[in-house]
Structures are given as C-alpha cells and as structure tokens.
Amino acid sequence: MDVGVGRIPCMVRKPGAERARAGNGLLLESRAPLCEPTMFGFRSKKTAPTPDAPATPEETPEQKEGWFKRLRAKLNQGDSWLTYDLANLVPGGRIDDAVLDELETRLIMADCGVETTDRILSSLRSKVQRKELDNLDALLKALRGALIDILRPSAKPLLIDESKRPFAILIVGVNGAGKTTTIGKLARLLKQAECKVMLAAGDTFRAAAVEQLQVWGQRNAVPVIAQGSGADPAAVIFDAMQAAQARDVDVLLADTAGRLHTQTNLMEELKKIKRVMSRQDPTAPHEVLLVLDASQGQNALQQAKLFHEALGVTGIVLTKLDGTAKGGIVLAIASEMRLPIRFIGIGESAEDFDEFDAESFVDALIKPTSEVG
C-alpha cells in the first residue's frame, strides 16, 4: 500500500464519505467506512459540517508561519548553510563553475551524498550551458526546482484503510533514533483527531523502555499493552492486536527493540513480529514506519537500506533535524530510496513534529535573494 505524509487525521464514529482527506494529509480510505475523518486543520481544505459533526478549524496563517520559522531556524542554525554568501560568489551576476563547485561542496558536506549531489549539479550545469542561469535569482530558482523534483515524490500522505481494524503500524529503528518519542507524538496527533489509539510495548529488552512508553500512554490517555522486561516482543504485540480488535481500536502503534542494525538477530526478531501480526490479520502490519536519526548522516541512509531490505519499509520519520544535521540526508533518502517520508522532527516538543512537505522544506533551506549575501 502506498503511504506518505501526514499530520494524522482521524475519526468520528459515524458513516462517512467513501474517501476523504483528513488534516495534514492523512488519507482515510474504506470500502465500508467506519469513521469519518476529523481534520487537524493543517494545510487542508475544510469539509462542510453536518448537523451532528461540527467543523474543525483550519490551521491559521500564524500556525503555518510558526512551523516554517522554526523549521528554517532549526535546519540552518543561523545562516542558510546552502545559500549564505552566494551573492559574493556571483560578481556581476555571472554564474560560473566556481559557484557550482561551491554548491557541490556544501551539498556533500550536508550529507546529500555524491549520487544525489551529482543529480542536482547536473541539472544546474545543463542550464548554465544553455545560458539559462545568468543571475543569482535564476540560480536560486533552478536550485529550488531541482531539490523539489527530488523530494516531491517522497511527500506522500499516509493512508489509513478504515476496513483494517485496527490499522497496525509497526515502528522500527535503531536505539536512540527516537522511536518511543515518535510513537508518543503520533498518539497525541491521533487522539486530537479523535482516533481510538492503543500502544504496544514491544521493546522488552531496553531498560525502562516499557515504562517510557507507559508514560506516553498516560500523557495521551491511551492504553498500553505491556508485559515484563525480557518478555517475548512478538507475544506482546500479538496480545495487543487481539486487545485492539476486542476494544474496537482504530490505530495500533507497536514499539520494537532497536539494537544495532548490523545485528542479524534484531532483523530476524522483527521479521518474526511481522509474521505474528499477520496471523491475527493477514494484511498486518499495514505500515512499517522506520524512524531515523537525521544527525547520523549517511549512516542513516545505510540503516534505511538494511531495514527496507529486511522488512519492506513503507514510510520514514526523520528526527533530530534540530541538531548537527543540515537536512541533506533527507535529499539523499528521497533520491536513493524513493520511500515516502512521513514526518520530520525538529525538537523535543510536540509542536516540533510535523508532516513532511517538500516545498516548505526546500524553502526553509533556500533564502530568497534579498537575504542572500
């Protein structure tokens, strides 16, 4: 199933349209609708209210601007790493090899990788040869277009099939990537959208992992299915699948262990969990969401390749873009993996977690000409 971006939507329990867009991009599809989406109000059209379903307010311009400002500030930590000082490299407005070489260096240093950087630069060099880039404005416009062309195919909404009860999302990733925090933030968004949510504490190996997830469950008023430390993770998640079905849960978020991705036993364990989930529902898990620490750079790309090969990843969350990461790894993953990037995280607070939008991300990286110098 094709899945993508979204600040999740959800559901008021009543018959609804056969297909509706909810909130920041989460799409709900159902052959026999069980729920009608309630919108977060982030970058979405407002649906007309029915007598028993009040309209949900759209995201205000101030909210949109607030997220964009935080995104730009966190990605750049001051000056735009990609376009700062470019005006000084374009004497008389002439775009030459020196300017393109500088851009190439910046892209590689920002973890875009050689392959992705070559793809971007080849597009720009061909335009220079055709004399289409004769000033800084034209260069920035072409650069923006090249980056968006890479990212847009990965900016896909997350699809929740309402005929799947529960819609089971398996969260995977190495220790320290931010899986449990991501689960907590997703649970919060789902609750805001009136989804009935349950968490499964499948990381039974890491010290205090179960307790950490239970704290998120209490914070969001969401039930957590857990067993003791050292319990069989597959058994925990199987129990959670049964409980979610019995309690008519909309979405189940399953945490997993995250020991080093180079350990074969971890991948085998995750494969076992997938098999066990499919015994309860042959179509489960309905989403395999990989959480990556963006500050890991090219190592995050290697993690994505290994997890995808082993498990068939259907969506990615990139966390910690507020740290040392400059965002280039987002371009590398979109270019080389061509997997949907669901969400990005730029901080610890719930407001620092949002759906991935290609245009906003690129605009946060590239300052307008008036600010470049």
Outline where the language-model segments fall:
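P-loop/Walker A NTP-binding module and the surrounding RecA-like catalytic core of P-loop NTPases
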Residues: 115, 148-373
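Non-catalytic terminal/linker segments enriched in charged/polar, low-complexity residues
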Residues: 4-156, 163-170, 192, 219, ...
